[in-house]
């Protein structure tokens, strides 16, 4: 029976996110080919949500 303890943490040594070509953040997923910050690879438009800014901010 394998657990999620200390021995399993040693397997987490692969690079998941690299620098994005569009926004420059370290959020581009190398396997999914999508940036979690700006949405590059998924959409031509920038990733933006209503909850990401305060109400009344323009």
Curated annotation (Swiss-Prot):
BP term (GO), one: translation
Signal peptide interval: none
Alphabetized GO MF terms: rRNA binding; structural constituent of ribosome; zinc ion binding
ZnF (C4-type) residues: 20-38
UniProt xrefs under PROSITE patterns: RIBOSOMAL_L37E
Co-factor remark: Binds 1 zinc ion per subunit.
Alphabetic keyword roster: Metal-binding, Ribonucleoprotein, Ribosomal protein, RNA-binding, rRNA-binding, Zinc, Zinc-finger
InterPro entries named among the record's database cross-references: Ribosomal_eL37 (IPR001569), Ribosomal_eL37/eL43 (IPR011331), Ribosomal_eL37_CS (IPR018267), Ribosomal_zn-bd (IPR011332)
Keyword Transferase: no
Function: Binds to the 23S rRNA.
Family membership noted in the UniProt record: Belongs to the eukaryotic ribosomal protein eL37 family.
Name of this chain's protein: Large ribosomal subunit protein eL37
Provenance organism: Haloquadratum walsbyi (strain DSM 16790 / HBSQ001)
Gene field: rpl37e
């Amino acid at each position: 029976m394998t657990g999620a303890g200390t021995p399993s943490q040693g397997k987490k040594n692969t690079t998941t996110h690299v620098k994005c070509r569009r926004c420059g953040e370290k959020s581009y997923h190398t396997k999914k080919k999508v940036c979690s910050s700006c949405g590059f690879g998924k959409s031509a438009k920038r990733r933006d949500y209503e909850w990401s800014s305060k109400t009344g901010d323009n």
